[in-house]
């Protein structure tokens, strides 16, 4: 059985922290699906196609990374794509408490799917897509915080 991990997020935009988590997880899994969740009630800064293109460029050197988008529950998308693991990055204890609650609900809905946490590298722990969007909105230079495939 292949070890398939599902790495969900809005990736609006994808950051160095996201990229670092996926690259560090590559040796652990046969395949990592970077999955852009489509949420119609969320106002994204960047169109879905743009985000998907950036993620594909970022991981163009990684044949075991697949980029998709999905609607609905993450756990349902995991089942659809035969992923037995949900990959999450943790920047701090607040992230852990939030992610733990979601993982417990996912476990209740589908006990065969495990959530795997990787601590964010300290260099990227202060970065979030929200902060990066704020830098961009205020015409600052966000490039140092963006994944390698992103050019603004």
Can you name each region flagged by the protein language model?
Residues 1-152:
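Nucleotidyltransferase catalytic core that binds NTPs
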